[in-house]
């Protein structure tokens, strides 16, 4: 069956018939192997959104595509914080296209912060593993099978995407953004010694119970939140694996990084240095 629609100017199909026909021969064998590897695991993807009307249809389509091709059980939880651009209305259309068993809408009335968005999402997650990632297409779902493979190789508590190892990298940033990111990562490595190469990235896979404990312990907001998550994971002796990823600057909308966020980052870094 093909479920399709036209959302936010993008034509979508949840499972194209051509893709299912390709699941023969080597494709079918590969999918069977991945299903066996997945066991009884289920993956909940948390997508906090704010003004992501144009990006949401494509990121959801890509997530559905790569999860369906891999054969892993999954759900996508959209946590919209009262976006004025109609993001929630688009999410409702996506729920109709793909089904309420795959697309779960858990909106909030206003913008309350990333940490509380994760707490809210975890409360509704039915998977034993949780992906966190940006909804603005900066994180490509094609890396999801790599995360799952890495986690199973070492039974890691956390698998973090890294832009600074192997084939990882950043595309679409100007020199200023690259210098800020590299500089922030360099300083945090010196001060905090976290045991991970990319502290400020936000594409990660957690065991659900691990994510719950980390979110409860973290007090930071904004861009420091992701950094504190890794630092606290190290403090609690959680194992951390890494997967090289390519980060691509958002396709639609404006970056939420500004001067206030940079100042907050520096304050948060000093706080973590003093308390860890």
Give residue spans per PLM region.
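Hydrophobic helical membrane-anchoring modules
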Residues: 1-42, 146, 191-194, 217-276
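A conserved acidic beta->alpha catalytic loop
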Residues: 80-88, 137
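Hydrophobic targeting segments
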Residues: 41-47, 56, 63, 74-79, ...
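Short, well-formed alpha-helical segments that are part of the catalytic scaffolds
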Residues: 52-68
């Amino acid at each position: 069956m093909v479920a399709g629609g036209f959302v936010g100017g993008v034509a979508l199909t949840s499972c194209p018939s051509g893709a299912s026909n390709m699941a023969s021969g080597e494709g079918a064998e590969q999918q069977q192997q991945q299903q066996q590897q997945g066991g009884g695991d289920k993956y909940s993807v948390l997508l906090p959104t704010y003004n992501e009307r144009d990006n949401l249809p494509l990121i959801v389509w890509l997530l559905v595509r790569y999860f369906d091709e891999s054969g892993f059980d999954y759900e996508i939880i959209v946590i919209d914080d009262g976006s004025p651009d109609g993001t929630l209305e688009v999410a409702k259309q996506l729920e109709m296209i793909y089904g309420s068993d795959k697309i779960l809408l858990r909106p909030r009335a206003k913008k309350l912060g990333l940490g509380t968005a994760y707490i809210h999402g975890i409360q509704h997650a039915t998977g034993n593993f949780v992906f966190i990632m940006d909804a603005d297409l900066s994180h490509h779902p094609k890396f999801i099978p790599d995360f799952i493979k890495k986690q199973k190789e070492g039974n890691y508590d956390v698998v973090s995407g890294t832009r600074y190892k192997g084939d990882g990298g950043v595309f679409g940033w100007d020199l200023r953004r690259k210098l800020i990111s590299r500089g922030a990562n360099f300083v945090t490595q010196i001060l905090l010694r976290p045991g991970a190469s990319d502290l400020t990235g936000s594409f990660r896979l957690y065991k659900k119970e691990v994510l719950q404990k980390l979110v409860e312990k973290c007090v930071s907001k904004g861009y420091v939140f992701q950094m504190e998550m890794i630092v606290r994971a190290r403090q609690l002796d959680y194992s951390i694996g890494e997967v090289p990823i390519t980060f691509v600057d958002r396709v639609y909308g404006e970056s939420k990084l500004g001067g206030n966020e940079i100042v907050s980052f520096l304050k948060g870094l000093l706080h973590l240095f003093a308390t860890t």
